[in-house]
Design a protein with these regions (language model features):
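Acidic/histidine metal-binding catalytic segments
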Residues: 92-103, 143-162, 176-183
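Divalent metal-dependent phosphate-bond-processing catalytic cores, especially two-metal-ion Mg2+/Mn2+ enzymes
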Residues: 40-47, 69-74, 78, 82, ...
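Active-site flanking loop/helix segments enriched in acidic
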Residues: 53-79, 111-123
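His-Asp-centered metal-binding catalytic motifs of divalent-metal-dependent phosphohydrolases/nucleases
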Residues: 98-125, 133, 137, 156-167
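An active-site-proximal "capping" alpha-helix that borders the catalytic cofactor pocket
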Residues: 79-87, 128-141
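Short, Lys/Arg-enriched N-terminal segments with co-localized hydrophobic residues
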Residues: 15, 19-38
């Protein structure tokens, strides 16, 4: 099955459909047509994502894949797709929402590539990549049609992408749109755990690990950490401020399932330990932050909220 269909999702759905057909054919009282229609719809969903992925790969040909920052964002995109699927399935979401989460993950950072091409930077001051990406997809040219032919979810996808990097998620009243806006934000942060461990520090922050650890944590940055809040970009002064802000952002997680994955991989402690902190005071603060955050995560997991 895998050799024939080149996709685990499609192979499983085809195989299950085969079993279902055999079962209903031997059970005349079953609604064979209804069950087969459902299986066909599930297969269509995986085909939709495969088509979107192929279109995304074609879009990437407009950029220099050999560029370290471009490469980082390509890997991050597919990491977010996997993270979104993992979280969604742990939450028990239906297959349509799982596939929708994957499509949003695929397109969430589409604005980043132009930002890197123009400015060679991830800094929010150079471009609001989320708003730019939403405009790119849903503006007059309707680039979204390259990736998703069905327009039923346009508003949901646009809102989720546009708000995925907002400091705080606000202003969404539709329940399903809010679900996916929260889900992409969690998936984005979850894969950023991997990024902070695997990518070179020079690509991330322009200096090596020692250079990151030489700074002093700014008072406003530490206040945000102790308030269990994300750090404002404008409050960051030194490279160590950036590094600690990457950890503090994990207070802004929506679903306990995301925290479960983070704890399984021991992400917070591993990210903190990547940098050698020159000042004892900085090391002490990082230890405090890691301990408090892990306690907070465990409480959210226990309470399932």
């Amino acid at each position: 099955w895998l050799r024939k269909y080149n996709s685990l999702d499609k192979a499983l759905i085809i195989y299950v459909k085969y079993i279902v057909v055999v079962f209903v054919q031997s059970s005349p009282n079953r609604n064979k047509e209804g069950i087969i229609i459902i299986m066909d719809e599930l297969l269509d969903l995986t085909r939709d994502f495969d088509a979107a992925k192929a279109a995304f790969e074609a879009y990437l040909d407009e950029y220099d894949r050999a560029d370290d920052k471009i490469h980082l964002k390509i890997e991050h995109t597919y990491g977010v797709v996997d993270a979104a699927e993992d979280i969604a399935r742990r939450m028990g979401l239906g297959e349509e929402d799982v596939q929708l989460a994957k499509v949003i993950g695929l397109l969430h950072d589409i604005g980043r590539f132009e930002q890197i091409k123009r400015f060679d930077s991830f800094e929010p001051g150079t471009m609001e990549h989320a708003a730019y990406g939403a405009q790119l997809l849903f503006g007059p040219e309707k680039m979204i049609r390259r990736f998703v032919k069905d327009d039923r979810f346009d508003s949901l996808i646009c809102t989720a992408i546009e708000k995925h990097s907002d400091f705080k998620l606000e202003g969404i009243t539709d329940e399903r749109t809010l679900l996916h806006a929260k889900l992409i934000r969690d998936a984005d942060k979850l894969d950023n755990c991997r990024v902070k461990l695997e990518e070179s520090m020079e690509t991330l922050l322009g200096v090596d690990e020692k250079g990151v650890g030489e700074g002093v944590i700014a008072p406003k940055v530490w206040e945000s950490c102790m308030a269990k809040e994300s750090v404002l970009s404008s409050d960051r002064v030194s490279k160590v401020d950036y590094w600690i802000s990457y950890i503090a952002q994990y207070y802004d997680i929506n679903f306990p399932e995301t925290y479960e994955i983070m704890r399984e991989h021991d992400y917070v402690k591993r990210i903190m330990d990547r940098v050698p902190y020159a000042l004892p005071e900085t090391q002490e603060k990082m230890d405090i932050l890691a301990a408090e955050m892990e306690e907070y995560m465990d409480e959210r997991i226990r309470n399932k909220k």
